Structure formats: structure tokens, C-alpha cells
From Swiss-Prot:
Any GO BP: DNA replication, synthesis of primer
Cofactor: Zn(2+); Mg(2+)
Keyword Transferase: yes
InterPro entries: DNA_heli_DnaB-like_N_sf, DNA_helicase_N/primase_C, DNA_primase_core_N_sf, DNA_primase_DnaG, DNA_primase_Znf_CHC2, DnaG_bac, DnaG_cat_HB, DNAG_N
Swiss-Prot/TrEMBL catalytic activity: ssDNA + n NTP = ssDNA/pppN(pN)n-1 hybrid + (n-1) diphosphate
Gene behind this protein: dnaG
The entry's keywords: DNA replication, DNA-binding, DNA-directed RNA polymerase, Magnesium, Metal-binding, Nucleotidyltransferase, Primosome, Transcription, Transferase, Zinc, Zinc-finger
Recorded GO CC terms: cytoplasm; DNA-directed RNA polymerase complex; primosome complex
Protein name per its UniProtKB record: DNA primase
GO molecular function: ATP binding; DNA binding; DNA helicase activity; DNA-directed RNA polymerase activity; zinc ion binding
SMART domains hit by this protein: TOPRIM (SM00493), ZnF_CHCC (SM00400)
Originating species: Staphylococcus aureus (strain Mu50 / ATCC 700699)
Residues reported to bind Mg(2+) 1: E266, D310
Length: 605
């Protein structure tokens, strides 16, 4: 069974693609459209465009895009039915997936999806064990003494893994899951001598780890009895890879986009407490350095990142190393320096939520200011270090994209070197990126002053160097897209096999399917009828193609005649052959081609 088209239309009409895409991509208005870094492939120059008017999106680079359903399918790697259900939930329109899929050949879930399902099922069991069983009472008390309310425990899905070697094993086995797959998912361990399986997590408080889409892909089990290690995380699996996961990104994404800033903490416990205190744009890595994949995710949401690591030597070293790397990646980097020996959880516990949020708001420095304040003693007493760090800081400031923030950093840093802001600014000139540094490519770029160059309209590169026949096919399709009556009048006038451009041929077929179910053409609806990025790009290209609104007298008939010339030798090609015969001096061929041209001209009269 198919989902009722009226339900699909209602969900699409209630879902604004700009709002949807903005949850995943930082967008900037460029002319009539919005542009940002593509969420589907890694890039440094924005090539992902959203049209609010047409309710479609498209990437110049990887060619992915479409309407709200296709974007959701791609970004979450789910089926069309699942995308409709997800967006339906978003706009409070009910979609019964079970009824939709009944009596149909539903594909068996992939291994990755089954792994996620296992994690989400056992989470419910862990939560029950924590909140409803005698065995979980000690763990629950431990959490409550550390400020975890019942509401927070439920919100975060925190649970308890009993001290049993087969609690999770038996549960998943009863549910019909493959035990070896549960091992590959990281929920079970294996005895390599007899290949028996047992629970990986035992007698631990269980914190679910979610991916960017909010699906549970792993766990961190915390001891509450002093056993080692303090935290036991899921191993690397097909669905849980530390270099790709930022804890709390699924919850923080909207706030990151709204505030245009992401705050990076050291651990997920700090994130939970900071979020509860009111700091909603916080994330953390899972005990690893910030990876290139992490930076790619961050850059698509914001260009401003604030580091708030623990107030100890290790935290300071990590801040310097991470901040330097982020600055090199073109991000605006800020630092919040916690009091010595404190982490966010301890600060909140000592001073309270309000004091913490006020501190975060008022004690934020540029990375350059933080760095020079850490190095100030060495700068003051070591002349060799003075010169070295002056060059380093000059280079750091030169990497800052905002001239306003750059000037602020100059004013903050100059006193540490006993130089005027003007002298420091002069030093920075030697480290400034050249004017032509800014990248430019086929997707748009920057001029010599760093000003943005508008890319071509979506898909227009497809229309370069078209033949005469292809130009006729393009114009013909454009008129058919504008009016259903025009389509019905001319559909049988053209044999689809006469199209020389295969993409245009497929569009012709798509229009037939589309108008069979719709009375008025709409690009946002039409893209649902295609299943390839190339064809989707062709549809979008045609949508952007400028042509007179009303056809001139006999204009469409002329296009039909040109299209139907395929299979027949055209006068244009005969003239070409005549010229070649003349060049080589073949009189017989010249006579033959002249006769053919005369005959063709008579047919057209």
C-alpha cells in the first residue's frame, strides 16, 4: 500500500525546507537563495543551495538534494516511508507506517539498523532496571546524590546494567536478534577460547550515546563502586565511531544554529550538567581529540567554536593544541578558562546554575588572548621566546576571518609584548594571507577582496554547449512544464526515442507520470518522481532555465519538428557533408548532396 497522496502533500506543505535544512547546515542568504556547506560531502567552499521559493535544495558538487522528503532520506539514510513518518511527526500529521507497509514486501532491516534497534531496545530495559528494581537502587541513589533528578534521568535515558553476565545477552536472544551481530554492535563480549558470548556492560550506570540523528549507537558505562575503568565505552563498531560522534549534537543542533556558536567540553558528564544549567549549545567528544570529521560537522553549523576544558594543566594543553588546529581550519576560536582544578560539573556544584551561565557569558576570550595569557611569564622573561611567540601570535591573529575580532585581538595581545597595537598590526601584515588566497571554483567563491561571487543558478552547467536539437528539446520541455494542457496537446506529437539528450528523454517520461496524478506542475512535487541525482539535477536545471512565459505563434510546433528530425539526415548535416565534398574536389558527391538538400527544402515548403 502507498501512503495517501493527500497525507504526503499535507506534510510537505507544512514543512518549510529552509527551516529543515537549517537544522543541519549553516545557511547564508545569497540573492534569492540560501547557500552553505553541503551536509553530504566534505567541502570548504559552499556549494549547497536552498530555494525557499521552490522548496528544494541542491548541491553543485555531489548533486544530492530534492524536496523535504528527499533531503530527510539522504541526511538520515532512511527510506521514503520513514522520511514521511519522521516529517509527519515533526508537523503533527499522523502516518501509520505499519498500515502503509502491510501486505507489501518490506525489506529486511540492514545490519546497521538492527544494531541501532538493539541499542534502543536494551535502553528501555536498562532504564527499567535502574528505576524499578532493587538491584538498581544503589546506582539510582548514587545519581541522585550527584544532582540527577528523575526527570533528567528519564530525559537522558540513563539506565543500569545489572551485575549479570547474560542480562543483555538473554534479552536480545529472546527478541530474536542474532547474538553474533550483537557482539559486532558492541553490546556483548566474546570468549575467544570457546566463542561464548557474555554482556560487555555489567554493574554499571549506562549512559546512551546518540548519533547526530538522535539514534542510540553506543553506551558509556560508569562505575559507582570504584571498579576500573571509571568509564567503559562501546568499542568501535560500524555504527559507533568516536571520530564521527559528538555527544549531544542531536539535542544541541538547533541552539548551535540559533546562537551561531558551539561550545566544546571535555566529557559527556560535563555536557549533561551544562545543558541542565541552561547552556544548550554544548557538545563533547568521546575521550578523543577533535577529528577532521568532527570539524566538518561543526563547520556546517557554525564558524564560531568555544573551548571550555578542565581548569588543570592537561586541560590547558588540550585547549592550546585544539584551538591552534581549529584556527588553522578557518574557524573563529574562543576560550572559557575555568578556575584552576575545576571542571564544569564542579563549578555548577559549587556556585550554581545561574553563576555558571553568567560566567560563560562574561568570561570568553579569543584564542589569541587566551594563548598569550598562558604564555605571559615566558614572554616576559625569555627574550628568545618573546620573538618566537610574537611571530606565532601574529600569525594566529592573521588567520582570524573577522576584521573586528582581529582588531580586538590585537588590542588584547599587544600589551603582553610591550608594543603598541599599531606595531603589532604591522607585524601581522607579514603573516596576512594574500588577497588571492580565497578559493574560487565552479561552485562560486571569493574575489580578491574576499567578497562572495554568486555561483551559477542551480544546474545551469548542464546547459553548456547544447546542440540545436538539444536546445529544441530543452525549450519544448520547459513549455510542457508550465502547463498541463500544453503537455496533453503535444505529448503524442513527439516520439520519446527521438530525444537526443537522454536526460531530457527521461524528463519527458517523468512529466507523463507527473501529469497523470497532478494538474499543475510544481518542482517540489516533481522531484519525487525521480530517483537519481543526475535526473533530479536536470529537472532543477530546467526549472531555472529562463524562457518566454507564453510561446510565440508556432513556436512549440517548430520545436516538435526539430525533435522529430532525428532519424532523418538534417539539412545542417548535409550542408556540412557538401562542404567536405567540395574541399576534397569530389564532384559526384557534391552533386549527390545538393540533390538531397533540394529535396529536404521542398519537404519543408
Amino acid at each position: 500500500m502507498r501512503i495517501d497522496q493527500s497525507i504526503i502533500n499535507e506534510i510537505k506543505d507544512k514543512t518549510d525546507i529552509l527551516d529543515l535544512v537549517s537544522e543541519y547546515v549553516k545557511l547564508e542568504k545569497r540573492g534569492r537563495n540560501y547557500i552553505g556547506l553541503c551536509p553530504f560531502h566534505d567541502e570548504k567552499t559552499p556549494s549547497f543551495t536552498v530555494s525557499e521559493d521552490k522548496q528544494i535544495c541542491h548541491c553543485f558538487g555531489c548533486k544530492k538534494g530534492g524536496n523535504v522528503f528527499q533531503f530527510t532520506q539522504e541526511i538520515k539514510d532512511i527510506s521514503f516511508v520513514e522520511a514521511v513518518k519522521e516529517l509527519g511527526d515533526r508537523v503533527n500529521v499522523a502516518v501509520d507506517i505499519e498500515a502503509t507497509q502491510s501486505n507489501s514486501n518490506v525489506q529486511i532491516a540492514s545490519d546497521d539498523l538492527q544494531m541501532i534497534e538493539m541499542h534502543e531496545l536494551i535502553q528501555e530495559f536498562y532504564y527499567y532496571a535502574l528505576t524499578k528494581t532493587v538491584e538498581g537502587e544503589q546506582a539510582l541513589t548514587y545519581l541522585q546524590e550527584r544532582g540527577f533528578t528523575d526527570a533528567l534521568i528519564k530525559e537522558r535515558g540513563i539506565g543500569f546494567a545489572p551485575d549479570s553476565s547474560h542480562f543483555c545477552h538473554d534479552f536480545l536472544q529472546k527478541k530474536g536478534y542474532d547474538i553474533e551481530l550483537a557482539y559486532e554492535a558492541g553490546l556483548l563480549s566474546r570468549n575467544e577460547e570457546n566463542f561464548s558470548y557474555y554482556d560487555r556492560f555489567r554493574n554499571r550506570i549506562m549512559f546512551p550515546l546518540k548519533n547526530a540523528q538522535g539514534r542510540i549507537v553506543g553506551y558509556s558505562g560508569r562505575t559507582y563502586t570504584g571498579q576500573e575503568p571509571k568509564y567503559l565505552n562501546s568499542p568501535e563498531t560500524p555504527i559507533f565511531q568516536k571520530r564521527k560522534l559528538l555527544y549531544n549534537l542531536d539535542k544541541a543542533r538547533k541552539s548551535i544554529r540559533k546562537l551561531d556558536e558551539i561550545v566544546l567540553l571535555e566529557g559527556f558528564m560535563d555536557v549533561i550538567k551544562s545543558d541542565t544549567a541552561g547552556l544548550k549549545n554544548v557538545v563533547a567528544t568521546m575521550g578523543t581529540q577533535l577529528s577532521d570529521e568532527h570539524i566538518t560537522f561543526i563547520r556546517k553549523l557554525t564558524s564560531n567554536i568555544t573551548l571550555m576544558f578542565d581548569g588543570d594543566f592537561a586541560g590547558s594543553e588540550a585547549t592550546l593544541k585544539t584551538g591552534q588546529h581549529l584556527l588553522q581550519q578557518g574557524l573563529n576560536v574562543f576560550v572559557i578558562q575555568l578556575p584552576s582544578g575545576m571542571d564544569p560539573d564542579e563549578y555548577i556544584g559549587k556556585y550554581g546554575n545561574d553563576a555558571f551561565t553568567t560566567f560563560v557569558k562574561n568570561d570568553k576570550k579569543s584564542f589569541a588572548h587566551y594563548k598569550v595569557s598562558i604564555l605571559k611569564d615566558e614572554i616576559a622573561h625569555n627574550d628568545l621566546s618573546y620573538e618566537r611567540y610574537l611571530k606565532e601570535l601574529s600569525h594566529d591573529i592573521s588567520l582570524m576571518k573577522s576584521s573586528i575580532l582581529q582588531q580586538k585581538a590585537i588590542n588584547d595581545v599587544a600589551p603582553f609584548f610591550n608594543v603598541s597595537p599599531e606595531q603589532l598590526a604591522n607585524e601581522i601584515q607579514f603573516n596576512q594571507a594574500p588577497a588571492n588566497y580565497y578559493p574560487e571554483d565552479e561552485y562560486g567563491g571569493y574575489d580578491e577582496y574576499g567578497g562572495y561571487i554568486e555561483p551559477e543558478p542551480i544546474g545551469m552547467a548542464q546547459f553548456d554547449n547544447l546542440s540545436r536539437q538539444e536546445k529544441a528539446e530543452r525549450a519544448f520541455l520547459k513549455h510542457l512544464m508550465r502547463d498541463k494542457d500544453t503537455f496533453l496537446n503535444y505529448y503524442e506529437s513527439v516520439d520519446k526515442d527521438n530525444f537526443t539528450n537522454q536526460h531530457f528523454k527521461y524528463v519527458f517520461e517523468v512529466l507523463h507520470d507527473f501529469y497523470a496524478e497532478n494538474d499543475q506542475y510544481n518542482i517540489s512535487d516533481a522531484v519525487q518522481y525521480v530517483n537519481s541525482n543526475e535526473l533530479r539535477e536536470t529537472l532543477i536545471s530546467l526549472e531555472q532555465y529562463n524562457l518566454n512565459d507564453e510561446p510565440y505563434e508556432n513556436e512549440i510546433d517548430d520545436y516538435v519538428n526539430v525533435i522529430n528530425e532525428k532519424g532523418q539526415e538534417t539539412i545542417e548535416s548535409l550542408n556540412h557533408k557538401l562542404r567536405e565534398a567540395t574541399r576534397i574536389g569530389d564532384v559526384e558527391l557534391q552533386k549527390y548532396y545538393l540533390q538531397q538538400i533540394v529535396a529536404k527544402n521542398k519537404e519543408r515548403m
